[in-house]
């Protein structure tokens, strides 16, 4: 749409026009497209396809696994309150713990895939897994908690950003509007308080809002003729007529007229950075397209068809002098850009910057959601590892070789029964109630395999299986970096 409009605008730019029907048609169509786009507020959707649900499910899985694999204190009473638990009000603690138990009980109701009768997660306390596995569970849960907090912050920032965008759109459309509420746009009372010229030329009225400028190109100071609106559109509709703009009430009553026409004739585009750029480009190309030999700067800073004089936008005739002049705004200071001089364009640029910020927020939101899902996969692996730890530790304990004494040494030591001193001096093991009453035996001979550490004592640098099968991929547990998750 914008490309076609720009081509039509460029094709008709810098040509001499006389008064007549639709003489401001290009300008009107451009304003209609802008007005429709801003009024519709078709801002990019906050939600991304399926990611919200998947991220929420990922957090539920992470939180559930961490709970059933936590130490007894966390499992029984939940995480510490915001305040230091040592200073926690003892009257408040029972209520907090009760809520935690209620929440924890929901985990038991999560059914195993394909078997609704069995719970998905079983309790696996820390003393039944290796210390390395417990440390990895802690790390993943910390990373996931940080991602979840950042997601909540981003959601708040996105909501605030949307209100700020709506505010700028409202200010562009109508002076004094733009608080994020549904807008009833009207031209500016102050600009039209005296007469047409105060709003449509000079340095105070032009460019304050789209409503002001739209009235300027489609109405006159004195005429009530149907041809007044026909300067902008060929639609003949008694409800679309303008009356004289001497009075504020008439000015405000007239403004909805072109909006009804815009709704019939112009498309409604999505509000994007690209479309804002396109509408500014189209406006720049359209500015000054009606050349007038006697007009100020030959009408270079006039929007619409004005009179061929130095007072081109006086609105004094039904079909000849309806335009808005930005001359005083643009030339007031050397080097002033259009966006710097024309207030409504400045507001569009602010809205565009906020749309860019919104796009970056949405991208960050998607990254955090993807991160949560990756962490959920890792947490599931660690849950399987915790189950494997218990089986492996039990198996190692069962297979540990029994220590047996050397038979020759045993015979030699038996000579020192009831002789504590001699027993010890000959490297034997004494067990007795008195120095002269007791047994002397050979010390046990250790097995050929190294002793196995107990639960929670495994070397933090050992290799841990992540899935519980003998041929599965293994990772080093110390140091635990998870570098691929720290983005």
Swiss-Prot record:
Superkingdom of the organism of origin: Eukaryota
The entry's keywords: Cell membrane, Glycoprotein, GPI-anchor, Lipoprotein, Membrane, Signal, Trypanosomiasis
Cross-referenced Pfam families: VSG_B
Protein's cellular compartments: Cell membrane
InterPro entries the record matches: Trypano_VSG_B_N_dom, VSG_C_dom_sf
Keyword Glycoprotein belongs to the record: yes
Signal sequence coordinates: 1-19
Lipid attachment in record (GPI-anchor amidated serine): 470
Annotated region described as Disordered, given as residue ranges: 443-468
Maturation propeptide residues: 471-487
GO CC annotations, alphabetized: plasma membrane; side of membrane
Protein known as: Variant surface glycoprotein WRATAT B
